[in-house]
Amino acid sequence: MKEVGIVGYGSDLPKYRIKAEEIAKAWGKDAEAIKKGLVVNEKSVPGPDEDSATIAVQAARRALSRSGINPKNIGAVYVGSESHPYAVKPTSGIVAEAVCTSPEVTAADLEFACKAGTAGIQMCMGLVSSGMMDYAMAVGVDTAQGAPGDALEYTAAAGGAAYIIGGKKEELIAKFNGTYSYTTDTPDFWRREHEHYPKHGGRFTGEPAYFRHVLSAAKGMMEKMDTTTKDYDYCVFHQPNGKFYLSAAKQLGFNENQYRYGLLTPYLGNTYSGAVPLGLSNILDHSKTGDRIFVVSYGSGAGSDAFDITVTDRISEVINKAVTTEELLSRKKYIDYAVYLKYRGKIRM
């Protein structure tokens, strides 16, 4: 495979946050027990003028700022999400036009629960490595919803990150050493057409779903690359909550110094398709030349994509060309449960 890698990346988060205590108070629940059980303290909430398209556009523009490339040279735009604003009207077309790509671009909206963004990255890798195009963009983004009173309401959040994939060695911020996927038919989480909120299998979402796929993909990736956890400086996993993330990292043998920058859920919630792309963006913001990163996404239904990535010396040139993920995390305004219901359109007549 021709060498391909990341030439630009960018992230975006809404500024609004709601604390677990605020949600628990509305439902008469024990906030401390919930925070301890989920390892989530607060989550992001999109404003009334924000959706997956607006977040994707902001992230894509920041990725372009870091890349320094002409957007008209981008040959593909893929947006992975399970909360596209329209049932019939592609988010990818909105993003492509907003960042001024040429109309001569292939674009598509992707869905695979929370791993649609990493699936898009794999597609971009294939297109660039084949020589079909010089650059391709993948975005992972969501404005996730949970039914009022459901456990998901404490975690379902909003945010996303964009990645521009290229094959010119001198432009790479980080190169892909390899990728590996693991997929089965596992019904742990679903939502049918016309239903407002998803359903989930409760505890079934753990061992036979999340852990089976994440651990299998992780072990398969390391076997393919002939590596161990000691070969990596950082790691990031899908994070439906902080508890699952920490358990997966520790089961595989990663330590806190390796997994800390990728773990955003305690301060952000689960951004679904944006979770791993955002975690990776925060790692890149803190990386230096030669750092090796281990990445595993997860999407219910179910599947995982794994990546082995090495950071290049260009990283120091681009980090400050756009706002960092950590800066976005610090820009926050807390809202109460009533405002949250209003912003998320949960009051239905």
UniProtKB/Swiss-Prot annotation:
(3S)-3-hydroxy-3-methylglutaryl-CoA binds at residues 30-31, 114, 155, 205, 238, 270, 300. Disulfide bonds: none annotated. It catalyses: acetoacetyl-CoA + acetyl-CoA + H2O = (3S)-3-hydroxy-3-methylglutaryl-CoA + CoA + H(+). Gene3D superfamilies: 3.40.47.10. CoA binds at residues 203, 243. It comes from the Archaea. One of its GO terms (biological process) is isopentenyl diphosphate biosynthetic process, mevalonate pathway. SUPFAM superfamilies: Thiolase-like. Keywords: Acyltransferase, Isoprene biosynthesis, Transferase. The active site is at 82 (proton donor/acceptor), 114 (acyl-thioester intermediate), 238 (proton donor/acceptor). Its EC number is 2.3.3.10. One of its GO terms (molecular function) is hydroxymethylglutaryl-CoA synthase activity. Pathway: Metabolic intermediate biosynthesis; (R)-mevalonate biosynthesis; (R)-mevalonate from acetyl-CoA: step 2/3. HAMAP family: HMG_CoA_synth_arch. Belongs to the thiolase-like superfamily. Archaeal HMG-CoA synthase family. Catalyzes the condensation of acetyl-CoA with acetoacetyl-CoA to form 3-hydroxy-3-methylglutaryl-CoA (HMG-CoA). Functions in the mevalonate (MVA) pathway leading to isopentenyl diphosphate (IPP), a key precursor for the biosynthesis of isoprenoid compounds that are building blocks of archaeal membrane lipids. Interacts with acetoacetyl-CoA thiolase that catalyzes the precedent step in the pathway and with a DUF35 protein. The acetoacetyl-CoA thiolase/HMG-CoA synthase complex channels the intermediate via a fused CoA-binding site, which allows for efficient coupling of the endergonic thiolase reaction with the exergonic HMGCS reaction. PANTHER family: 3-HYDROXY-3-METHYLGLUTARYL COENZYME A SYNTHASE (PTHR43323), HYDROXYMETHYLGLUTARYL-COA SYNTHASE (PTHR43323:SF2). This is Hydroxymethylglutaryl-CoA synthase. It comes from Methanococcus vannielii (strain ATCC 35089 / DSM 1224 / JCM 13029 / OCM 148 / SB).
